[in-house]
Amino acid sequence: MPSVRSVTCCCLLWMMLSVQLVTPGSPGTAQLSGQRTARSSGSTVCKMMCRLGYGHLYPSCGCRGKRDVVSSSMAV
């Protein structure tokens, strides 16, 4: 049975790849209709990545502060 951590990582990876495909203006990515939807879903994923401490993987998200490894809280 897969662990919660591995399932969470798979879900996050899938979401990151999905956002990469629908981000308007990115070179070599698909352009879907409804660009407002693409931006809002990207924003939601960025917020989640920042909260989980993975914002450093996506500099375009502009996360502020660094994740404190010991307490898992954001240090500004």
From Swiss-Prot:
Pro-peptide region(s): 25-39, 65-76
Signal peptide interval: 1-24
Modification Arginine amide occurs at: 64
Gene Ontology CC terms, in alphabetical order: extracellular region; host cell postsynaptic membrane
Disulfide bonds: 46-61, 50-63
Main location: secreted
Example of a GO MF term: toxin activity
Localization annotation: Secreted
Origin superkingdom: Eukaryota
Entry keyword Membrane: no
Tissue expression per record: Expressed by the venom duct.
Keywords tagged on the record: Acetylcholine receptor inhibiting toxin, Amidation, Disulfide bond, Ion channel impairing toxin, Neurotoxin, Postsynaptic neurotoxin, Potassium channel impairing toxin, Secreted, Signal, Toxin, Voltage-gated potassium channel impairing toxin
Entry's family note: Belongs to the conotoxin J superfamily.
Known role: Highly inhibits both nicotinic acetylcholine receptors (neuronal (alpha-3/beta-4) and muscular (alpha-1/beta-1/epsilon/delta) subtypes) and the voltage-gated potassium channel Kv1.6/KCNA6 subtype.
Domain remarks in the Swiss-Prot or TrEMBL record: The cysteine framework is XIV (C-C-C-C).
Protein name: Alpha/kappa-conotoxin-like fe14.2
Organism: Conus ferrugineus
